[in-house]
Amino acid sequence: MTLKEFKDQNKLSYKALAKLVGASDATVARRWCLEKSHKDAMIPDRHFMTSIIEATMGQVMPNDFYRD
């Protein structure tokens, strides 16, 4: 499952998603949810990746940021 799918399925705003994973800015969370081909897309660093795995209870994993 992608982070965007998790966000949408749980009806979270980007601000709520950022807070859930410990990011200080909703813009960062928004960039994590963009298609990987988008010029502004970002992949979370190790710290946030761990937070994302924990916050989503394993529904979003690192490989989900790399698949098409």
Task: Please identify what each model-predicted range represents.
Residues 36-55:
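Short, basic-rich loop-to-helix N-cap that marks the start of a DNA-contacting helix
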Residues 29-31, 60-66:
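Solvent-exposed interaction patches of small proteins and small membrane subunits
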